[in-house]
UniProtKB/Swiss-Prot annotation:
Its main location: nucleus. PANTHER family: FANCONI ANEMIA GROUP M FANCM FAMILY MEMBER, FANCONI ANEMIA GROUP M PROTEIN. This is DEAD-box ATP-dependent DNA helicase Fancm. A ssDNA-dependent ATPase with 3' to 5' helicase activity. Involved in multiple DNA-damage responses, some that require ATPase and helicase activity and some that are independent of these. Involved in DNA interstrand cross-link repair, probably together with Fancl and other Fanconi anemia pathway homologs. Independent of Fancl involved in DNA double strand break repair, including contributing to the synthesis-dependent strand annealing (SDSA) pathway. Probably contributes to SDSA by unwinding short duplex regions in complex D-loop-like DNA structures. It comes from Drosophila melanogaster. The gene is Fancm.
Length: 1489
């Protein structure tokens, strides 16, 4: 059976072979039919041969590959340096001949590579320059469209070609039909959606008949990659060679590969281990979720990226993990930190640290924000490394040299030192050689560049990176800079090139003897082969591999093992063969069989690029313009022979010759003036639009400047060079010009010295350097050698000495009368200055003088015409006296200079504004200060003006205003504000003194307060007023007035020192009232003062920011004092037990009697969570209800203590801060007070009122105000649900009645529960006093310092006791823990008592005896939920099963029906949500009943 199958298989194979042969013949027939269409535009005259150049050495493999590429779409795979560009140039030239109207495109991935290929191709084959062009993205689209239409050979990047193809879809400007050949360099990039693939697809869609030639040294990592390249580029033929091929081996230069393994030092191992420990938790979570498998030591960044991609794909398909977001976050953390680990191992600690630097916007890496241990590790390593080498610049200075770098820089890895040793040894042995260092990242390139700069001039490194955007310390290069760097490297200006991957592919850098691979990026052999291919191109080379021990070393081994395997397997790979393009056009008519014709090809002579030539013509024109303007004018006139008479005259007249004495006299005059009149008159040519007077003024000014200056003979170097280059100018005058311009000679000499030190070849000089060289050669010709030039450089400039003497003794000082006479002659007949004359400086001087004069006049008028001033020594003496008169002032003056008031500003200043123009200081002091800083300064005149004003303050009149008296709370320390510098910007407290003898208690309402100390004000006022002897009486009166005015402020200091030790004397409101009374008394006592309104007093008493802060501090102390236990509280509690049913008026009386000595001015609601409110070390004080009653009574009948004194203190002043301003009750508040106990608001309205209320406190419900039971603050949410609402008869205590009035005190929101009340019902019977509640309160009342008080009504309604298992009372807010609980014998729901704890009797094993109804049933932390069934359940076993309980309830209800008692309808089930603040960490407790 098997044999029969084998025979059948052989027959099948034979049949298939015959079918394929027939199919191929049919395909050939179709090709010949379509040959005419494919060869459209073919030149029949050139079809019999194809040209191969013989001016270069013949290589058989190149000729074979060219012949194959002419007729098939070919992929050429050759090792680097074996002439792939030569093959491409020969194929391009033959298609250029065959298709005279066809177009050829050569594409390379980078711009430097494109520029290199166009020059190499033109050297190999003679492509005419008029038909060849290089296209870049810098050219505009319209310009490129014109080039596509007019040129034939294009060198461009694939991105530009694809862009023009897409642009041509609507306009059809791209010549799709004319494209006959496309050459693709570095073809291994043609994968995915790269531009190579897109260009081929676009062209194939429009034109199927074109030739494709692809070039690469490494077509792919795997066979699948090579097959993808073949499919994307429509390849039908492969031409593959490797290093050991027979026809290639003679042309291969030997490359020595040397591997240097660098071991990790301890300084890297320790941070590496710490980083692995930081990664471990995130990696373990991925493994526990079964997302990733592996060990933390073997995991790599690439494997994590692959697993993350797979996880995202599974999630997109509907297999979303429950912890998707957590897993994605762990992936991100692991990927980022493993990347940092690779940087640390391969590039060192410096690159590792810099990887975590913030971006350009200042945002730090998310891994640092998420993990604090990683942040600490990075900061520690950064501190250990020291200075960052990237902080030092490598740009050349003005002299052309790079500044030296420190030699002790730490680069963070041993690789850098090995690299230094390898390169220094190589270049010491081979000074004329060149080397390339390849790195993965730009940051490593920058570090290596700075490392090698330390060894100049042996090493002359240059960086070569891409054109990408700048990232951190790395930078990007432009195309022009890239080309210049490559040119310098090829010419030998720089001998070390430090490059990234941009230097790996295709660049022909000439003869490079050494390649250093600083790192191994991946196991892909493509990049490795590309790197080592930069050497050994023309002679033997050396490759040095620097690898770190461990994973990088293993990667290198894998690369070396696989680098030659791919190319050898290409030809036998079935995957690659199946991917070849079968419909390959021949592109040559079938009747032609072109033969190879070897021909000597002369390359086209190099022509300078048009842009450069255009730029040079512009420069040359600019350079020749001044020469044309200052040259000889003879060419502008026609030369005609002289007449006979003219000849006779010329022959009879001898030429004039100046005598030696005249020449000496002229030289002396010229040297003495050191200025040329020619230049003066040339520069002083006035415009035609100027009037004659303006022209004369300008000429006079220029003449004066020229007479007083020591300018060189010819100031402009361009003018000087034009004179020196003039052939008609005698040599002696040129020497004189050089003597008069030594700076120009010295500058040119220095530039030439620097240029000669650089050893730059003549053909590499730029325009500026060539200009310097030409100028220097001209100077040498004029000086007849270096000897005379050195004399000019060393000689003294006599003209400068004469000019200096003229400066010291000008002409108008030598003879004033003569100078005045000359000036009168010059100005005789001139008109006045025009409006547009250039006299800005003169105007400024006049304006300053006029402004100063007006200010002094104004001050003198206001001060009664008194002018006085004193020296700065006197002012310094006054300042020294001031410093020691006040301790507070001395502290203030010892602050930094930035806050010290300058001596020109005084506390009292004259205010030159009108009486009605006052600016408020509140809200505008910042703006006024900054505006004062921006004011125009008048220099020393302001100091003089301030001194004059300060000296004249003794003559203050009644209608004038005095500068501000700074007032600040004396208890606030080191509180300073910047003083206003300008006298015009003072916005002080205006003190009006009509008689000069009276006191002031009130001030203007528009006045403002400077935040300075009282003593400082007094001292400065005194020191300012004691400056003049003739004003002593006025000074004494003013001092007396100020002492009277400021006397309460001194008491305020004493009060502030006493307030700290006293806890129950905070009488803010009463002091405010007392202060107003005192002010009124003072106001009536001083009738001779200015009449100031009450509004002025209120405005003056407004507290400042510091006062408000002081009040807030005192409030905190008041809260503690307010909540201190009082000795009367026990007495009050006993009275409440006896008199609980008495009328409410008795409570008011009792509270008045008990609190008569208590301060009644407290307006701030107490903080029951204060630190000292319920300390267990203090005796038990009054309850909150008692204190509230006492406060309410004090408000109704205020009785200030007799010993209270009203002072002008910020503590006693009326509060005007809008954030804590007292307001009249709103309608909503009145409604709440009126409806208390009669219902409740809707939830939405209640929340709205709570949110929009300006007062942060809300009222407490009536049934929650008097509870001595401390409520446990908790963050837990307790849901209480009951099927039936209890009918509860409210019990009104004595202390609750006073809260019915509108003067109730608002309590903090945190003290209140949700104010939900059941509708009140009429009481039929007065309830009996429940002693169990008060007993329980006395026994279990909280004494903890952080616990608050709430009301009894809360727990009567909720019947809930929340306890805690914690025994550490310092960490919890609840001190009372209910250990046992019993039902109260009183017939009332919710009544309970707390008996002493009993010994637990374990009788659970006895089933025949009933369980006693004792406290053992209620364990710790139990909840007692109160409802109507509690009365029914009384006396029954709590442990009965639900069925028995239900049967019992049914029996009771049937019994009630028989007796005629109809049970009330059940109330709808309600869910009540309460949030109780707590400091414990317990979970949310939800209780549903």
């Amino acid at each position: 059976m098997d044999v029969n199958w084998m025979d059948d298989d052989e027959d099948l194979v034979a049949a298939l072979a015959m079918h394929e042969e027939q199919k191929s013949e049919d395909a050939d027939g179709t090709r010949w039919e379509h040959c005419d269409e494919a060869c459209d535009g073919f030149d029949m005259a050139t079809g019999h041969n194809w040209i191969y150049p013989n001016n270069l050495p013949l290589r058989s493999y190149q000729q074979t590959i060219v012949q194959s590429a002419l007729f098939k779409n070919t992929l050429v795979v050759l090792p680097t340096g074996l002439g792939k560009t030569f093959i491409a140039a020969v194929v391009m030239y033959n298609f250029y001949r065959w298709y005279p109207k066809g177009k050829i495109v050569f594409m390379a991935p980078t711009r430097p590579l494109v520029s290199q290929q166009i020059h190499a191709s033109q050297k190999i084959m003679p492509f005419p320059s008029e038909d060849t062009v290089q296209l870049t993205g810098q050219l505009p689209r319209p310009k490129r469209a014109e080039l596509w239409a007019s040129k034939r050979v294009f060198f461009a990047t694939p991105q530009v070609v694809h862009s023009d193809m897409l642009e041509a879809d609507g306009e059809c400007s791209f010549p799709f039909g004319s494209i006959k050949l496309i050459v693709v360099d570095e073809a291994h990039r043609a994968k995915g959606r790269y531009a190579y693939t897109q260009v081929a697809d676009c062209l194939m869609a429009r034109n199927r008949y074109f030739r494709m030639l692809a070039l690469s040294a490494t077509p792919g990592r795997t066979m699948e990659d090579v097959a993808a390249v073949c499919r994307n580029l429509y390849i039908s033929n492969l031409q593959v060679r490797w290093d050991t091929s027979i026809d290639v081996q003679p042309y291969i230069h030997r490359r020595t590969i040397r591997t240097i393994v660098v071991s990790l030092k301890e300084r890297i191992k320790e941070p590496r281990e710490r980083l692995l420990q930081i990664i471990e938790p995130y990696l373990r979570q991925l493994m526990e979720a079964e997302i990733f498998k592996g060990n933390k030591g073997t995991v790599s960044r690439n494997s994590l990226l692959f697993e993350q991609k797979s996880f995202v794909e599974r999630s997109a398909q509907g297999q979303r993990h429950p912890d998707h977001n957590i897993i994605m976050g762990n992936f991100a953390m692991c990927i980022s930190m493993y990347h940092s680990l690779d940087l640390m191992e391969r590039h060192g600690l410096r690159v590792f640290v810099n990887n975590f630097d913030a971006d350009d916007d200042g945002r730090e890496k998310f891994v640092l924000a998420r993990d604090g241990n990683l942040r600490n590790l990075v900061e520690q390593v950064r501190q250990e490394l020291g200075a960052n080498p990237l902080d030092y610049t490598t740009h050349a200075m003005t002299n052309g040299e790079v500044p030296p770098l420190p030699s002790d820089l730490d680069f963070g890895h041993a690789k850098y030192e090995k690299l230094r040793q390898v390169l220094v040894q190589h270049f010491q042995a081979n000074p004329d050689s060149r080397a390339i260092v390849f790195c993965e990242y730009r940051e490593s390139v920058m570090l290596i560049h700075r490392l090698l700069l330390q060894h100049r001039p042996v090493l002359r490194p240059r960086c070569f990176v891409g054109q990408g955007s700048t990232v951190g310390a790395s930078y990007a290069l432009t195309q022009k800079q890239q080309l210049q760097i490559m040119t310098d490297f090829r010419s030998g200006t720089s001998n070390v090139l430090v490059a990234t991957s941009i230097g790996e592919e295709g660049l022909d850098v000439g003869e490079v003897e050494m390649i250093v691979c600083f790192d191994i990026c991946s196991t892909n052999p493509t990049r490795f082969i590309q790197r080592i291919g930069r050497t050994g191109r023309k002679k033997n080379g050396e490759v040095v591999m620097l690898v770190t021990e461990g994973r990088e070393q293993q990667v290198l081994k894998d690369v070396l093992a696989n680098k030659d395997q791919i190319n050898k397997k290409l030809l036998n790979s079935s995957v690659v063969k199946l991917s070849l393009y079968e419909q390959n056009p021949r592109m040559v008519p079938s009747k032609f069989q072109p033969k190879c014709e070897e021909k000597h090809m002369e390359p086209v002579a190099e022509e300078k690029p048009k842009p450069k030539s255009a730029a040079k013509t512009k420069e040359s024109r600019k350079r020749k313009q001044p020469v044309a303007q200052t040259g000889s004018l003879r060419k502008y006139f026609k030369e005609s022979p002289p007449t006979e008479s003219q000849q006779g005259i010329l022959q009879g007249i001898k030429p004039y010759q100046m005598s030696e004495a005249s020449q000496q006299l002229v030289k002396q005059q010229v040297l003495r003036r050191s200025v040329t009149l020619k230049n003066f008159f040339g520069e002083s040519q006035a415009s035609s639009t100027l009037t004659s007077s303006q022209e004369d003024v300008q000429r006079l000014r220029k003449l004066t400047r020229l007479l007083q200056s020591s300018k060189p003979f010819v100031s402009d170097s361009k003018d000087l060079m034009s004179h020196l280059q003039d052939d008609h100018l005698p040599r002696q005058i040129k020497l004189y010009l050089l003597k008069s311009n030594p700076e120009f000679l010295r500058e040119t000499h220095l530039k030439m010295q620097v240029q000669s030190e650089l050893n730059i070849a003549d053909d590499r000089l730029n325009s500026r350097q060539r200009r310097t060289k030409n100028n220097y050669q001209l100077l040498l010709d004029i000086c007849d050698g270096m000897d005379q030039m050195n004399e000019l450089l060393q000689g003294d400039n006599s003209g400068a000495e004469i000019s200096f003497r003229d400066e010291l003794n000008p002409i108008y000082n030598q003879s004033p009368k003569k100078f005045d006479t000359i000036c009168e002659q010059i100005f005789d007949g001139l008109n006045e200055h025009g409006l547009n004359s250039n006299n800005f400086e003169l105007k400024q001087d006049l304006l300053e003088k006029l402004e100063l004069r007006n200010l002094e006049t104004t001050v003198n008028e206001q001060l009664g015409g008194i002018e006085a001033s004193w020296s700065e020594e006197e002012w310094d003496q006054q300042e020294e006296d001031v410093k020691f008169e006040s301790m507070y002032l001395s502290q203030q003056l010892n602050l930094p200079d930035a806050n010290v008031v300058p001596h020109s500003s005084t506390p009292l200043r004259v205010k030159p504004l009108s009486k009605l123009m006052f600016k408020t200081l509140q809200g505008d002091i910042e703006e006024e200060y900054h505006s004062g800083m921006e004011a125009s300064e008048l220099g020393d005149n302001l100091g003089r003006l301030n001194s004059l004003m300060n000296a004249s303050e003794s003559k203050i009149k009644a209608t004038e205003r005095i500068a501000p008296i700074p007032v600040v709370d004396s208890t606030i320390e080191t509180n300073h504000f910047p003083a206003v510098e300008e006298s015009q910007r003072s916005t002080p407290i205006s003190i009006a003194d009509s008689s000069g003898e009276s006191n002031h208690c009130a001030v203007n309402k528009n006045s403002e307060i400077y935040p300075m100390s009282i003593d400082e004000t007094k001292v400065e006022v005194k020191s300012s007023l004691n400056l003049k002897m003739h004003a002593e009486s006025i000074v004494e009166d003013l001092d007396i007035d100020l002492d009277d005015f400021l006397e309460p402020m001194d008491k305020e200091l004493e009060l502030a020192s006493q307030t700290k030790g006293k806890s129950q004397e905070n009488i803010v409101d009463h002091q405010m009232e007392k202060l107003e009374k005192n002010c009124e008394q003072k106001e009536t006592a001083h009738n001779n003062d200015l009449d100031l309104t009450d509004e002025d007093l209120k405005e003056f008493l407004e507290p400042m920011v510091e006062e408000v802060e002081l009040m807030s501090q005192k409030k905190a102390n008041d809260f503690k004092d307010f909540l201190e236990p009082m000795p009367e509280e026990l007495e009050l509690m006993s009275q409440q037990k006896k008199n609980i049913l008495l009328p409410s008026t008795e409570t008011i009386k009792n509270s008045e009697n008990k609190n008569s000595h208590e301060d009644g001015s407290r307006t701030v609601s107490p903080d029951i969570f204060g630190s000292d409110s319920m300390s267990p070390l203090k005796p038990q004080g009054k309850s909150l209800a008692a204190k509230l009653a006492a406060k309410a009574a004090a408000k109704v009948l205020p009785c200030p203590p007799p010993n209270s004194v009203g002072l002008n203190s910020p503590e006693n002043r009326k509060r005007t801060n809008p954030s804590i301003q007292e307001k009249s009750p709103s309608i909503f508040d009145l409604y709440l007070n009126r409806m208390r106990g009669r219902g409740r608001l809707a939830k939405a309205a209640e929340n709205l009122h709570r949110i929009t209320s300006t007062n942060p406190t809300i009222s407490v419900p009536k049934d929650e105000e008097d509870s001595p039971i401390a409520r446990r603050p908790s963050k837990r949410k307790i849901v209480i649900s009951s099927d039936e609402e209890e009918e509860q008869k409210p019990q009104i205590a004595e202390t609750q009645v006073d809260c019915e009035s509108d003067d109730y005190e608002r309590i903090l929101d945190t003290q209140m529960p949700d104010p939900r009340k059941t509708p009140t019902r009429p009481r039929h019977k007065r309830s009996k006093f429940n002693s169990f509640i008060l007993d329980e309160a006395e026994k279990s009342g909280s004494d903890h310092e952080e616990e608050g008080e709430t009301t009894i009504g809360t727990y009567l309604k909720d019947s809930m006791i929340v306890s805690s298992d914690d025994e550490d009372h310092n960490d919890t807010n609840t001190h009372a823990i209910y250990l046992r609980a019993l039902k109260s014998p009183i017939q009332r729901p919710g009544a309970f008592k707390m008996p002493p704890p009993r010994v637990f009797r374990d009788e659970s094993h006895i089933f025949s005896q009933p369980v006693e109804d004792d406290s053992s049933q209620y364990m710790q932390c139990s909840f007692i939920v109160d409802d109507e069934s509690s009365t029914i359940e009384r006396g029954h076993d709590v442990s009965e099963c639900p069925l028995e309980k239900a049967e019992r309830i049914l029996k009771e209800r049937r019994k009630q029906r028989r007796l005629g008692k109809v049970p009330s309808a059940p109330v709808n089930k309600r869910r009540r949500l309460q949030t109780i603040s707590t400091s414990s960490d317990e979970d949310d407790v939800v209780l549903i009943d």
